[in-house]
């Protein structure tokens, strides 16, 4: 037997051993916190989630994509592998997709959950993106989850449809993908559809998003009534009333008093009970009214100071009264 084949065979096994020994073990970072639900027969782009978490000194040599338990022939790596594309997905494309990043000394992987659904009335709440505006305000409605498709075409044309209110002059598209709604009304609520044209390989594909717009009641600021000043005398019994009026959707507030760094709340006196707070709540004219009474009995010289009534709500409000002693 010639010694030459033996030498080549030894070199081959040694090389394979060294490559296997040097290959870094791949760290599984688990599943990405967000799941993806996309429409059947429309392009889907998934991001490699761990790329943004890698340190600036990490040099990625290769990014690989695969689907757990299936062939990878439906996956199209784009943007140097940092995203993956499926052009005409079907429900069979639902599943777990894995992004693997490697270099000479490091390897990690992270998975994403993709669900492909059909467009139907029964699925509309599953596939729609909820957005909220307030009545009688100026609000915005944004075509959601399209950044990956417009990264290379910031001037992409986006067409809105699906709601009769789009013909109203109060709704204007000043920026692609954003509808400004002036003087929001209750009947602006509903489902709106935005469609983006995505071009890949010389072909045009539609990317559809459905927005479920909710219009919340107009926020009427809470009001507070409190005198600017009161005059009393030493030894007297003084009561100061602070009246807080709330309108829906704001229906509750914590009302308390502050003076010289001390807090005075209902059922929480200053130790000797000389200063106390009593709150009363009642409804009137669709308003919830909280009357907070600060009682000082007896009045001392040290009470010639300021007391602030604070209503902790959204937004919080406060007023201050000055106590003078004659």
Curated annotation (Swiss-Prot):
Glycans are attached at residues 80, 103, 113, 206, 237. The keyword Zinc-finger does not apply. It comes from the Viruses. Keywords: Disulfide bond, Glycoprotein, Host-virus interaction, Immunoglobulin domain, Repeat, Secreted, Signal, Viral immunoevasion. InterPro entries: Ig-like_dom (IPR007110), Ig-like_dom_sf (IPR036179), Ig-like_fold (IPR013783), Ig_sub (IPR003599), Ig_sub2 (IPR003598), IL-1-bd (IPR004078), IL-1_rcpt_fam (IPR015621), IL-1_rcpt_I/II-typ (IPR004074). GO terms for biological process: symbiont-mediated perturbation of host process. GO terms for molecular function: interleukin-1 binding; interleukin-1 receptor activity. Disulfide bonds join 48-99, 143-194, 242-309. It is found in: Secreted. SUPFAM superfamilies: Immunoglobulin (SSF48726). Residues 24-115, 122-212, 221-322 form the Ig-like domain. The keyword RNA-binding does not apply. Residues 1-18 form the signal peptide. One of its GO terms (cellular component) is extracellular region. Interacts with mouse Il1b. May reduce the host inflammatory response by interacting with inteleukin-1 beta (Il1b) and thus decreasing the association between IL1B and its cellular receptor. Belongs to the interleukin-1 receptor family. This is Interleukin-1-binding protein. It comes from Vaccinia virus (strain Ankara).
């Amino acid at each position: 037997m010639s010694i030459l084949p033996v030498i080549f065979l030894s070199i081959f096994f040694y090389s394979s051993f060294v490559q296997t020994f040097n290959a870094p073990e791949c760290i599984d970072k688990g599943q990405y916190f967000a799941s993806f639900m996309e429409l059947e027969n429309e392009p889907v782009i998934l991001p490699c989630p761990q790329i943004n978490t890698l340190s600036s000194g990490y040099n990625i040599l290769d990014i690989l994509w695969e689907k757990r338990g299936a062939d990878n022939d439906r996956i199209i790596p784009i943007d140097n592998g940092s995203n993956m594309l499926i052009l005409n997905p079907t429900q069979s494309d639902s599943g777990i997709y894995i992004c693997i990043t490697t270099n000479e000394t490091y390897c990690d992987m992270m998975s994403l959950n993709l669900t492909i659904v059909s467009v139907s009335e029964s699925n509309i709440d599953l596939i729609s993106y909820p957005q909220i505006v307030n009545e009688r305000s100026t609000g915005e409605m944004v075509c959601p989850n399209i950044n990956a498709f417009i990264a290379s075409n910031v001037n992409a044309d986006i067409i809105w449809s699906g709601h009769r209110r789009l013909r109203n002059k109060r709704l204007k598209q000043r920026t692609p993908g954003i509808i400004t709604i002036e003087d929001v009304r209750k009947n602006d609520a509903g489902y709106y559809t935005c469609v983006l044209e995505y071009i890949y390989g010389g072909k045009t594909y539609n990317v559809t998003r459905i927005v479920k717009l909710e219009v919340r009641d107009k926020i009427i600021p809470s009001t507070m009534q409190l005198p600017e000043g009161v005059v009393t005398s030493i030894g007297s019994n003084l009561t100061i009333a602070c009246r807080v009026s709330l309108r829906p959707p704001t229906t509750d507030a914590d009302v308390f008093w502050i003076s010289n760094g001390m807090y005075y709340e209902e059922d929480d006196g200053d130790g000797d009970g000389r200063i106390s707070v009593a709150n009363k709540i009642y409804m009137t004219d669709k308003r919830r009214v909280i009357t907070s009474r600060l009682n000082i009995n007896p009045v001392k010289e040290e009470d010639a100071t300021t007391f602030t009534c604070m209503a902790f709500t959204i937004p919080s409000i406060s007023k201050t009264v000055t106590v003078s002693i004659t």
